[in-house]
Amino acid sequence: MTSLDNQGLWSEKDILKLLECMEHNIPSDDSREFKKSQADLNWSKVAFGLFSGEMCKQKWMEISYNLRKFRTLTELVQEAKFSFTKKTHKNKILTEHPDRPKRPLTAYLRFYKEQRAKYCQMYPKYSNAQLTKILAEKYRQLPAEIKQRYIMDFKKEKEDFQKKMRQFKKRHPVSGHPKKSVVPQSHPTKVPTKSQGDIKNVKSLVKTESPRTVSSDMKFQGEPRKPPMNAYHKFHQESWSSPELRHLSFRKRWVEISRRWHQVPENEKEHYSNQVKRLQKQYRVKLDLWLKRLSPEEYAAYKEAKATCGKRKNMSMSGGRSSKFGRTEQSSSEKGLQIKPGEVEELLDPGTDSSGTIQGHHDGAQSSRQDFTDDSEEDDSSTSSDSSSTDEDD
């Protein structure tokens, strides 16, 4: 798909400019299939700078090659623009509100700010790093009473800062820290009657046996991540973080993704299916290599954990005993189990009995929905953590 004329000419800024020009030239009432709108687009009006209409068209064909094409051209351009904008501004700090109070300087920074000019004159050839090292040492050598004065000034200004921040948040509630979700992540599970007498055991069981931890704990260090189970699972993972769906609630997002899946042409579904098959093959190879690196004890623990995965999920929901992940009986580790031919297939085979293989990963929509939810919540939590990391604490 890459043209020799376009290689090395397009910067990220140029690509964003191309997408903006395309947006301006797409009709506002665009609701047709993207191919029809793309065919009617006047590329001579899209052209800008050194890039002709034909070059712009060719570059757009390269960009849209990996995009899902069952939507309108407007939606495709918006998704491409969002992905490039996110990539360009990934490491930029969000601009703070102009009225937001400034956090006071710490005791050391106050000392540093006061003394830096003096030491710059004393050591004109020193770099900033060298000056900082000297001033840090000088601050450590300060008498306790002088250091206390800097600390008291900081505490006083910090109290004023906290008062101003409370007033600021009342005036600008959106600018403060994001509110925590009131939706519980998981329902509390029942605790066995036998453990009611031991309060510590009760608390640990509630924490370790929640539905969320059952699925997340079944993962050994270095174990390859499982690929999508089928074409719809792959489509769902890609669609979940799509910019035009982010404003929807989880439930509505599920419904919308399902609706869109029914509109996907058969050739697109076949494309997703082929991708999944390729990922499954890669996963089997990686898993096979990873299993061969395990010690006999680690392999025995892994096989036992995967064999009892389905049982453990059922027991956790009904309040049964849940053993710690990764533990195995001494007798199992002493056996020194080695990987035999076909063992990887046995561990991955969804059709075998649950007592000897992994159960619950492939059977039924409920398992599929649980996997979707885990992947989706990881995407949303990562986005949330990125945005909340720029806020300052009170």
From Swiss-Prot:
Keywords: Cytoplasm, Developmental protein, DNA-binding, Nucleus, Repeat. Residues 167-197, 305-394 are annotated as: Disordered. This is Upstream-binding factor 1-like protein 1. Residues 101-169, 225-291 bind DNA. The lineage of its organism: Eukaryota, Metazoa, Chordata, Craniata, Vertebrata. It is found in: Cytoplasm; Nucleus. GO terms for molecular function: DNA binding. InterPro entries: HMG_box_dom (IPR009071), HMG_box_dom_sf (IPR036910), UBF1 (IPR051762). SMART domains: HMG.
